[in-house]
Amino acid sequence: MANTLEQLKPFTTIVADTGDIEAIKRYQPEDATTNPSLILKASEIPEYSALIENAIDWAKSQSDDLAQQVEDAGDKLAVNIGLEILKIVPGRISTEVDARLSFDKEASITKAHKLINLYQAAGIDKSRILIKLASTWEGICAAKQLEQEGINCNLTLLFSFAQARACAEAGAYLISPFVGRILDWYKKDTGLEFSATEDPGVVSVTSIYNYYKRHGFNTVVMGASFRNTGEIIELAGCDRLTIGPALLEELQNSTTPIVQKLLPATEVVAPEAEMTEAQFRWEFNEDAMAVEKLAEGIRNFAIDQGKLEVMLKNKLSS
């Protein structure tokens, strides 16, 4: 019998949630995703030292101002790691906009353009890039404009139906609803354990997937942030799943049979009128879990971006 990972691939596009090139080679995903935390982790791998040095040299050539050099080096390093990953995956790389811009539409758009330009300068077409943005109202509005320019976006840190609906209405190419972090919140809040079928993160992604398919939205649903393989198996049939190396290995070493759980809609009906900003903010605010986890996620990505910049600043100053 084929291993569980291979059984999953006919139903769902597998994406590697890592910046570790060796892990990507091992599991042969279609796409890969990175974020500030993964870039920070990848920067500590000795084999990546040349990518860091290249980013440092490039930043020095762009400006004499240290603060600008640090920002430029961070952007170039994220793109350098993306370029290495694109040598392996046949599909796309997701590269994230600085989380500290999550509430600034215009700055997010400017940063997205910069990242795309860096990829294009290295010979990579924008069709192979997804720009990751937090699913704040401002991030969703930035994605709407970028999509109209032909720059595809991955809306991340998505924890609620309100966020998912707004992303689809904005024409986002892809969303990344976070399964495991939803589970974490409910376990802490209730003190209960949940089976894979009752897992609140699984239930959330299933609901979003069914809503999108029933209303004919083309936005891709890519489940993310998994805590165990049970969650992954319950979402077989989801458009895409982005999975970290440890769980990819577990799936590869398993022969648990896969049954497609998420299925296309049998009929498509017209969606409701688009949400206003006020509706979005109210509905999102009604979901305490989503409010807490989005804020926490932005803070944590910003912390790791800061740590990365300290490392780069030290190198730039030496």
From Swiss-Prot:
Signal sequence region: none
Biological pathway: Carbohydrate degradation; pentose phosphate pathway; D-glyceraldehyde 3-phosphate and beta-D-fructose 6-phosphate from D-ribose 5-phosphate and D-xylulose 5-phosphate (non-oxidative stage): step 2/3
Principal location class: cytoplasm
Official protein name in the record: Transaldolase
InterPro entries: Aldolase_TIM (IPR013785), TAL/FSA (IPR001585), Transaldolase_1 (IPR004730), Transaldolase_AS (IPR018225)
Subcellular location: Cytoplasm
Gene Ontology biological process terms, A to Z: carbohydrate metabolic process; pentose-phosphate shunt
EC number: 2.2.1.2
GO cellular component, one term: cytosol
UniProt keyword list: Cytoplasm, Pentose shunt, Schiff base, Transferase
SUPFAM superfamilies in the cross-refs: Aldolase (SSF51569)
Assembly and interaction partners: Homodimer.
Residue numbers annotated as active site: 132 (schiff-base intermediate with substrate)
Origin superkingdom: Bacteria
Pfam families reported in the protein's UniProt record: TAL_FSA (PF00923)
Described function: Transaldolase is important for the balance of metabolites in the pentose-phosphate pathway.
GO MF, any single term: transaldolase activity
Family, similarity comment: Belongs to the transaldolase family. Type 1 subfamily.
Catalytic activities: D-sedoheptulose 7-phosphate + D-glyceraldehyde 3-phosphate = D-erythrose 4-phosphate + beta-D-fructose 6-phosphate
